[in-house]
């Protein structure tokens, strides 16, 4: 049927476009803010007029790109690839005017206006506007993680996450904050950071209305209302709402006291106890000079019982 054929052709183009979007680390559906342009492999077999491309050394891929040398089996594939070099965007949206380099990208973009979601997950009935989005979603059900890091072996379900992870090893941080210059390995990390400058808190609690800058902070807060305690102590089974609380509790079993006092050497299990203890030292050591009115500390070895009412400068004058 014509409709089914069109869907199949669109899905084939979707697979081609996915190769462009995913390698870049973001799915932007062919729009202008692409950061890294990768080549796609179209499925059609149409010839296009124009100057014959340079020959390729590979007989199976006789059409080579004169700009980057990549070879293709079909001239039509090369013609589409050439747009990654020329920047040509021949497909325009009649609704908003945005232009795209591939027809499949325009088709997907058009669904942002129509709300159409023709691709349904057979597992959970969730619907998607693009076949590539459905394929990525289905990995949540199957557990498939096809992208493996050659450096550490960690695997990823999405190539965008894989591309961002690689920057941990390479040290690349291409996203710089325009406010403070701090650089990040992923655009999402930059977006979260920028909220520290803008004060934006887009995540609101449905129960009490408290707003948060990070979705993770909202998720933790929600446990106050739900009573959820997902973090369990492996020793005694006690459960906690936050991982930090579990870490503090675990020290009751291990005896670890990671906070030492530089004044007296006493060690503490909790940072709050350590801070309170330090303040006690400060209160004992700060005095107001009766001569000049300045604060001063007791000299080494002195105690409150032997302290004078004057600082060392006034006492010696």
UniProtKB/Swiss-Prot annotation:
Keywords: DNA-binding, Isopeptide bond, Metal-binding, Nucleus, Repeat, Transcription, Transcription regulation, Ubl conjugation, Zinc, Zinc-finger. Its main location: nucleus. A zinc finger (C2H2-type) spans 63-85, 91-113, 119-141, 147-169, 175-197, 203-225, 231-253, 259-281. There is a cross-link at residue 33 (Glycyl lysine isopeptide (Lys-Gly) (interchain with G-Cter in SUMO2)). SUPFAM superfamilies: beta-beta-alpha zinc fingers. One of its GO terms (biological process) is regulation of transcription by RNA polymerase II. May be involved in transcriptional regulation. This is Zinc finger protein 771.
């Amino acid at each position: 049927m014509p409709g089914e054929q069109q869907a199949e052709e669109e899905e084939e183009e979707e697979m081609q476009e996915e190769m462009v979007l995913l390698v870049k680390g973001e799915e932007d559906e062919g729009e202008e803010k692409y950061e890294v342009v990768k080549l796609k492999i179209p499925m059609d077999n149409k010839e296009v007029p124009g100057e014959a491309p340079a020959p390729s050394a590979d007989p199976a891929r006789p059409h080579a790109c004169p700009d980057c040398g990549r070879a293709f089996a079909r001239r039509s594939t090369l013609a589409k690839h050439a747009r990654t070099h020329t920047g040509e965007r021949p497909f325009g949206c009649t609704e908003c005017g945005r232009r795209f380099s591939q027809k499949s990208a325009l088709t997907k973009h058009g669904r942002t206006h129509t709300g159409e979601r023709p691709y349904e997950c057979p597992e959970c009935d969730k619907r998607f506007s693009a076949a590539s989005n459905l394929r990525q979603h289905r990995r949540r059900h199957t557990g498939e993680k096809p992208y493996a890091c050659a450096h550490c072996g960690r695997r990823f379900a999405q190539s965008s996450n894989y591309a961002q992870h690689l920057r941990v090893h390479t040290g690349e941080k291409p996203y710089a904050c325009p406010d403070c210059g701090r650089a990040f390995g992923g655009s999402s990390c930059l977006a979260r950071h920028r909220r520290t400058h803008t004060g934006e808190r887009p995540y609101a609690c449905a129960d009490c209305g408290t707003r948060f800058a990070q979705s993770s902070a909202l998720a933790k807060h929600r446990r106050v209302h739900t009573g959820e305690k997902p973090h369990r102590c492996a020793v005694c089974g006690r459960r906690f709402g936050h991982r930090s609380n579990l870490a503090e509790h675990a020290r009751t079993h291990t005896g670890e006291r990671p906070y030492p006092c530089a004044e007296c050497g006493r060690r503490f299990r909790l940072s709050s106890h350590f801070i309170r203890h330090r303040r006690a030292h400060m209160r004992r050591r700060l005095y107001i000079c009766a001569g000049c009115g300045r604060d001063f500390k007791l000299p080494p070895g002195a105690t409150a019982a032997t302290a004078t009412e004057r600082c060392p400068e006034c006492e010696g004058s």
